[in-house]
């Protein structure tokens, strides 16, 4: 028996306006609709068999989508064409493609840590820097700068 292999796509949803919120089902419908437009009935039917929104965090507008390995490239080529979800203008930004949810979670932590360190470097006041250091400590337990800051 052959093991089915999946790909997990970590995406960030960027909204035109602050305060817009979408749901997991709306993301699924928008992706299926766009796959149908680009690849026809066969593409939509093949993708629907394995396409699912596994994780969606409305607070950070980050989502993890699962699809079979065979159709991952089709989904990745479809994502830039998704412009609206539930009549809300959005931009979908692929952050990472991995073979497990855990690898996507690790990638998200790595991305967020880099963002915090870059915010630290661009902070103008000592108070801002102190707040960012405390945020990094609360999340990771330690602070280490990897070739981003000397001193």
Language model regions located:
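C-terminal low-complexity, charged extensions that often adopt amphipathic alpha-helices
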Residues: 2, 99-151
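A common structural junction motif
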Residues: 80-90
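Short structural boundary motif marking the start of a folded domain
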Residues: 5-9
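Intrinsically disordered, low-complexity regions enriched in proline, serine, glycine
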Residues: 43-44, 75-77
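The conserved glycine-aromatic submotif of the RRM
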Residues: 57-64
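Surface-exposed, low-hydrophobicity interaction/linker segments
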Residues: 1, 12-54
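Beta-strand cores of modular interaction/reader domains in eukaryotic scaffold and signaling proteins
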Residues: 10-12, 64-66, 93-95
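Helix N-cap motif at beta-to-alpha junctions
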Residues: 66-73
